[in-house]
UniProtKB/Swiss-Prot annotation:
Lineage: Eukaryota, Fungi, Dikarya, Ascomycota, Saccharomycotina
Annotated GO CC locations: cytosol; Golgi apparatus; membrane
Disulphide-bonded residues: none
Glycosylation sites: 121, 168, 445, 791, 1008, 1301
Protein name: Vacuolar protein sorting/targeting protein PEP1
BNR repeat residue intervals: 58-68, 101-111, 179-187, 414-423, 485-495, 531-541, 762-771, 859-869, 1141-1150, 1183-1192
Taxonomic source organism: Saccharomyces cerevisiae (strain RM11-1a) (Baker's yeast)
One Pfam family matching this protein: Sortilin_C
Amino acid sequence: MILLHFVYSLWALLLIPLINAEEFTPKVTKTIAQDSFEILSFDDSNTLIRKQDASVTISFDDGETWEKVEGIEDEITWIYIDPFNRHDRAVATSMYESRLYITNDQGKSWERITLPDSEKNISSRGCYIETHPLNKNYFLAKCNYCEKTEVDNEENSGDEEGAPVIFNITRCTDKVFASNDGGKSFSEIKSSLERNENSAISISDCGFAKTGKDSDLESSDTSIICLFQNMQLIMDEFSSPYTESKLVLTTDWGKSLKEFDQFKDKVVNGYRILKSHMVVITQGDRYNDMSSMDVWVSNDLSNFKMAYMPTQLRHSMQGEIYEDAMGRIILPMSRERSDQEEDKGIVSEILISDSQGLKFSPIPWTANEVFGYINLYQPTYLKGTMIASLYPLSRRRNRKGKAKGVKNKGVTKISVDNGLTWTVLKVVDPDNADSFDCDITDFENCSLQNMFYTREGSTPTAGILMTTGIVGDGSVFDWGDQRTFISRDGGLTWKLAFDFPCLYAVGDYGNVIVAIPYNADEDDDPQSEFYYSLDQGKTWTEYQLETTIYPNEVMNTTPDGSGAKFILNGFTLAHMDGTTNFIYAIDFSTAFNDKTCEENDFEDWNLAEGKCVNGVKYKIRRRKQDAQCLVKKVFEDLQLFETACDKCTEADYECAFEFVRDATGKCVPDYNLIVLSDVCDKTKKKTVPVKPLQLVKGDKCKKPMTVKSVDISCEGVPKKGTNDKEIVVTENKFDFKIQFYQYFDTVTDESLLMINSRGEAYISHDGGQTIRRFDSNGETIIEVVFNPYYNSSAYLFGSKGSIFSTHDRGYSFMTAKLPEARQLGMPLDFNAKAQDTFIYYGGKNCESILSPECHAVAYLTNDGGETFTEMLDNAIHCEFAGSLFKYPSNEDMVMCQVKEKSSQTRSLVSSTDFFQDDKNTVFENIIGYLSTGGYIIVAVPHENNELRAYVTIDGTEFAEAKFPYDEDVGKQEAFTILESEKGSIFLHLATNLVPGRDFGNLLKSNSNGTSFVTLEHAVNRNTFGYVDFEKIQGLEGIILTNIVSNSDKVAENKEDKQLKTKITFNEGSDWNFLKPPKRDSEGKKFSCSSKSLDECSLHLHGYTERKDIRDTYSSGSALGMMFGVGNVGPNLLPYKECSTFFTTDGGETWAEVKKTPHQWEYGDHGGILVLVPENSETDSISYSTDFGKTWKDYKFCADKVLVKDITTVPRDSALRFLLFGEAADIGGSSFRTYTIDFRNIFERQCDFDITGKESADYKYSPLSSKSNCLFGHQTEFLRKTDENCFIGNIPLSEFSRNIKNCSCTRQDFECDYNFYKANDGTCKLVKGLSPANAADVCKKEPDLIEYFESSGYRKIPLSTCEGGLKLDAPSSPHACPGKEKEFKEKYSVSAGPFAFIFISILLIIFFAAWFVYDRGIRRNGGFARFGEIRLGDDGLIENNNTDRVVNNIVKSGFYVFSNIGSLLQHTKTNIAHVISKIRGRFGNRTGPSYSSLIHDQFLDEADDLLAGHDEDANDLSSFMDQGSNFEIEEDDVPTLEEEHTSYTDQPTTTDVPDALPEGNEENIDRPDSTAPSNENQ
């Protein structure tokens, strides 16, 4: 009985706590408040504070009751706890001026701190106090001031306290004040940068060098680091603000400032002070805030070393940089600025340094082809643990109604050994295995994915973690499908807690957990509830709330996680003016009948499964999961026990600086890192021994392992102190060939797309330094199209009907399905003004491409390819014409070339509603059409296999293009549109089409593209229609062409082509051969020495021979510079026999720089020039930093490679180049890329005045030594003068100035239509022709009433000359037919007004004469007294002033007439006397003698026409890079009875755009040259 009673009692003792636990309900207290969103806890206390509206409230009982604080008089903007004095100090910032409130006793009392008054015209936008970790009295107050904006209402002037203030945020200043007496007094740390009138924002950012009580930095307690910056709002030419900066150190509270010498000539973008390091980030280009950045690291605030970065750092997030327990620097970075607003500011990559902080590398498994957002979480209390998530940026969109494609896979992984090894987050939950869509035992394909691990789980626990996420393979992530999971082993394994996402918090070191669903309806109950667990998440209990709230935060009231009291803050939208907050205080402190755990309730939990981490084994004592007690060690931190490991292993080591880990994890030498280090500077030997491993800094393992040295080759490694030492090379090896590449043309970064021989796409955002494979979901990429109007957009076509589009340079892609039609390989056509609008061409009824029913269909999309609509059947090429013209007749106009299935002809149709209701046939039969520079040109077949061209500048009015009737021009069978610029079209008209013997004439149009004149004859052309024609980029009117010098014999098939190179400096009006250099690159004279350029000149290989048509002679950013491969002699030699030549003055003078053919590339606007041998293996490049004066060789790789191409960004403004090469390896060849970075070889960035004024580094100067006029003006260009600085992102080519406009000379004119340039330089009419009918202009412009005859000359459109020769002076005006009346009215005068004026004048003269006669002559005796009157006579009647005036007139008249009469008489007498003498002396001579002088203008000989040319010019483009060949069969040609319409070259009044996308060449070709001739009359 006694035994039974004992068993019963024992059972009761065990059961009662369980019953109490099941019946336990936490104490919940509710408080209702307005607009309260953040609650703060004082550490190790029961005191909480929060901001409510504009006041501060406080609770001294863990949130159960609240009261308004006393002592704060102002409205408060925000409050915060002092991070170094979390137990008792908080700060509240005032809304008014420079005032703050501070408490040092947990909010019981508050002291007002007033900062020094600001200037009268500015006002504070808020202040923030930073405190010192070691001295409680040290303050740094940071304030922001902005100029006040004028307001009309005096009541709102902001002068009175409480009045609203309007700030001008474009004129703001930061100020920093320091105090060493607890805020009683402050002194300003004044910026050492002078703020000028252009500085919009002035930034001062100061911080104590000590950032924690455990700081390892060598600094004093009073050391303060300050960064001062001035930012200027830049004019339109720039893409970003200009920044100047100074980084300084002060130890005397700002009285003296010491600038860091290493950053004097750099732009410091930001800095971060960590426990062991100070990190400084410098901006590579002060004129581009998106430029790449460098990271500098110091551990003594004195010596900084530049860290090695595996990729470009462009958008750092300095505020997120931190240091882990090993002293490694964690550097989050955003590598892009997405076009998608929601993507901005999100971390896209995380780099981790070695323990020295000098070599960064990405998290290994994130450096793959999937690019996305990265999130890294390191719980500080779990040493060595890292949880990282990668969320792919690829966005996939599909046609409505179609199944979704597979997304790029995201992944979440965990490491418990500081990132040495990683595993997925395993879900070990057999009870819920059926609730998941995948097999949770297949960890690699079914694991927990958490895209953003929140900091809510940062409360210290013994390995107990919670998170939200979904279980799967990472291919699908829908935020609405998230669930809540829990782990008890530090994150290695997880189990399901809730089927919905929750906010959560832990207490009592993880023994109490509170979770609240984001959505109250998750349990089909509209009322909110929270759940709690007292057994570390094993079981959960629901607590119902009476109100529906949106949870804002749930938190433990003790930040160290030791307490068992929580705060739940939620809100409802109760009224329009704000929110109503419900604050719940939840108390679990009496759980388990208030029992405290005893020793046997605890167990040991080992971190990292008991393995050594950083040379130490860690363990934590934690409560057993089912123990019926709470730890109740409130305000005590969680204890972590450690035991040093005896032996060091490879896990305790990292690769030395000169080594990197290969695919197997072994540390191998890296040539680039060897160059950056100094290991080879210490030896003269070819090799040096270096240990590949180094012990991790701070590792605590006891016995180091033996590390054997590895011999590193120092052959070719530059020595310290040389510029070559600073060149950085990155090599990438591939087992395939790159067949296509193209850069995105932006300054944001150096992004490019590459396609390999397997049809796989690769993307790089750092100029090829790091390359990622694009996941096309198994589809081969068969075509890539870049949007020519939107530089960040490109489209990739998949082999299975997908289209992958990017609008952010390849950072993210959207996938859509193309219409269910056969891909025909036709390019997309884009709308120039709508990024998401384009036309795709697919084949319909095309089971076979040869099927008779197979035809093309144009599909239109307005949403970037998400949906397509069928626009037009049988369309093979369309243009959004309305978006191309400057003044379109209709902005929605679309033109399409249509080829009907049943017809062999093609027609041109247009529509203004995408062919829904409107369809207009423009031409019934065409060969093809193209758009260029604001024109659309249509090729129309004519009789006898000829072509005619029609041009429009508005899409409605078409005019026939009239070609000149030169004697050597037969049929118009083929022509190539070369380019259009400055209102003219350049066109090549083929005159000989025999394959291999092609050539023709170079023509130029008037402003509306309808009247052409011949510029040069026998210009070289190839069979594909490409022409040796190139306009020099960035300069006005300079063109290079190759002519066939023996064209007559070539046409007769007697000789092969002999090419010569010619150049023009006035847009084709005059041509000369290239002047050869006197000596070659070795200082020797050229064998060809004739003074005649016709016999000895420089010749260059041109456009028709290029492997890549993007490799132009010149660069638009390197003004005046050109490279070319050629020779000096009578004719052009084969390519292999040529040398490489260079010019800096636009082609006036040349120099040989290499004896063999080389490839070239421009960088930094010509500030860095690079050459690499062509068609021969090499391991070196040549580069120049002084505009080609001197050249240096640099070895960029260990073994020789055959360089296929060298390239850089399209604007040639970068300092980074990309080489594509192929090298022979064992077992075959490998394709390689080399990224060569020259950023560090320059001492500094050139100092540039953003207003375009001259500075110490930039001066205005003419392009060449000559200063004569070109295009009617003298121009100077802003050019760099110092070779030791780099230019950067300055549009230098846009800064030029015209010194003056010159008088017009012969060089400012070209021949008009039907005129040609004769040998004497004059323009003469073509024999047998008449000038164009000038009256035709009246037909084209009905409003005209007059026209003028042509003089034979027309002024070059680019010329701005004034005065001087007027060779284009018009004739007298002629009346337009039918406008004779208007013409007569314009130039004739009406008889009525003329008669009135004439009679009026006669009447006035008659009256005056009668008055003088009556008062002065008749009254004084009449004409009879004329002979008696003498000057001064007193006999005249003078009764008043009128009489005296009249008498004076009479006397003066008499005097004048008397003298004239005497003079005539005397002259008559003398002449008679002389004649008499002559007759007497020469009486035998008969008849007169005559001479005549005809005065006329004359012109210089042709050789003198170019004398004195100034090479200054401005902004021309290269010609187009894509040919469109249009062929016509015999059946295509209809018989046309109409003859040519009459024509005039007078331009229309319509303005025409003068811009043309560079790099395009269009060819309209009629290959049939055997048809009979049809002479045009």
